[in-house]
Amino acid sequence: MEHYISLFVKSVFIENMALSFFLGMCTFLAVSKKVSTSFGLGIAVIVVLGIAVPVNQLVYTHILKENALVDGVDLSFLNFITFIGVIAALVQILEMFLDKFVPSLYSALGIFLPLITVNCAIFGGVSFMVQREYNFTESVVYGIGAGTGWMLAIVALAGLTEKMKYADVPAGLRGLGITFITVGLMALGFMSFSGIQL
């Protein structure tokens, strides 16, 4: 149990997708204007990562890995296309669910919901799972932890962005300029966790 808690904490803070690996920056910067929208997208990323990583782990272990189907057959060259297909299917299911049951969040997320399909944070989580050879349970914990870390970062940035609306930001830094500086300072803060050994 301690191993799984360590893996979760590591994936949320030490190896944060957004602030340590800078993955998923397109949606991270574009949707971080309001806390409510950022929180909704963060939940969507947690759901997609929490399902995509373990499902792709099963696909990789039982189909794509060398000697998984037949001795001597290695289908790992199909990793990228297979993983993207699984992620795309999961995002489509999530999009239909939100459209049906939470239309306000669906309309607030707009084009960024389908973009989760090609969000490099999602694909990065799946790729890290393969590279680190996580088993199924570790994949579930890692997927949920990585999504939680990404949500924590985007909600924190949205909160800071909302506060900066009332700040006296120099004209040349308004908009993306101050956002990049803020993200850089947040990343420096998260770097302090990198010395922790779990």
UniProtKB/Swiss-Prot annotation:
This is Na(+)-translocating NADH-quinone reductase subunit E. It is found in: Cell inner membrane. One of its GO terms (cellular component) is plasma membrane. Belongs to the NqrDE/RnfAE family. PANTHER family: INTEGRAL MEMBRANE PROTEIN OF SOXR-REDUCING COMPLEX, NA(+)-TRANSLOCATING NADH-QUINONE REDUCTASE SUBUNIT E. Coiled coil: none annotated. Keywords: Cell inner membrane, Cell membrane, Ion transport, Membrane, NAD, Sodium, Sodium transport, Translocase, Transmembrane, Transmembrane helix, Transport, Ubiquinone. It catalyses: a ubiquinone + n Na(+)(in) + NADH + H(+) = a ubiquinol + n Na(+)(out) + NAD(+). One of its GO terms (molecular function) is oxidoreductase activity, acting on NAD(P)H, quinone or similar compound as acceptor. It comes from the Bacteria. NQR complex catalyzes the reduction of ubiquinone-1 to ubiquinol by two successive reactions, coupled with the transport of Na(+) ions from the cytoplasm to the periplasm. NqrA to NqrE are probably involved in the second step, the conversion of ubisemiquinone to ubiquinol.
